[in-house]
């Protein structure tokens, strides 16, 4: 199944998905993909997992869509018991494999921790999560401890031009046109 490959471990690891429950008795597992198109997770190889603090390379033998699920067969994992050991393992790749983005497009991982500030200079807090809502992405912003409006968290739509006025990843800052009381 896997072997220690210290020289090849990701320098810039990013989680692209998670291995789910076993499927059948021959070592297949369900996969939950975090990529925009679920099947795109298979475009990024090699996969790594961490178990007991150690990196392990995971080589795919096969994958397929089964009903609504994606299922995988990991090389060397041939029964339910062996597959069960991989349940809930995060699928990790090196983020240098991700394609370059166009202007005004951002990977969520790059927005995490950015300070969100209104156009009037009010600091709303830091981005702690992103959510996909169907119509647009939404930032979950953890408010500063002494927020003047008593907020703990805010949901701010990630609408470039409309709400998002400027993103400076170097300064870890996102400027928004947003009412701090909302």
Swiss-Prot record:
Keywords per UniProt: Chaperone, Cytoplasm, Ribosome biogenesis, rRNA processing
Q: Which InterPro entries match?
A: PRC_barrel-like_sf (IPR011033), PRC_RimM (IPR056792), RimM (IPR011961), RimM_N (IPR002676), RimM_N_sf (IPR036976), Transl_B-barrel_sf (IPR009000)
Localization (cell)? Cytoplasm
What cystine linkages occur within this chain?
none
Query: Which domain of life does the protein's organism represent?
Result: Bacteria
Instruction: Tell me the Gene Ontology biological-process terms attached to this UniProt entry.
Output: ribosomal small subunit biogenesis; rRNA processing
A GO CC annotation given for this chain: cytoplasm
Residue ranges of domain PRC barrel in the record? 103-182
The protein's GO terms of the molecular function aspect are: ribosome binding
Q: What does this protein do?
A: An accessory protein needed during the final step in the assembly of 30S ribosomal subunit, possibly for assembly of the head region. Essential for efficient processing of 16S rRNA. May be needed both before and after RbfA during the maturation of 16S rRNA. It has affinity for free ribosomal 30S subunits but not for 70S ribosomes.
What is recorded about the protein's domains?
Answer: The PRC barrel domain binds ribosomal protein uS19.
Quaternary structure?
Binds ribosomal protein uS19.
> PANTHER family under this entry?
RIBOSOME MATURATION FACTOR RIMM
Q: Which NCBIfam families does this chain map to?
A: 16S_RimM
Give the family from UniProt.
Belongs to the RimM family.
Report the protein name in the record: Ribosome maturation factor RimM
Q: What is this organism's lineage? A: Bacteria, Pseudomonadati, Pseudomonadota, Gammaproteobacteria, Enterobacterales
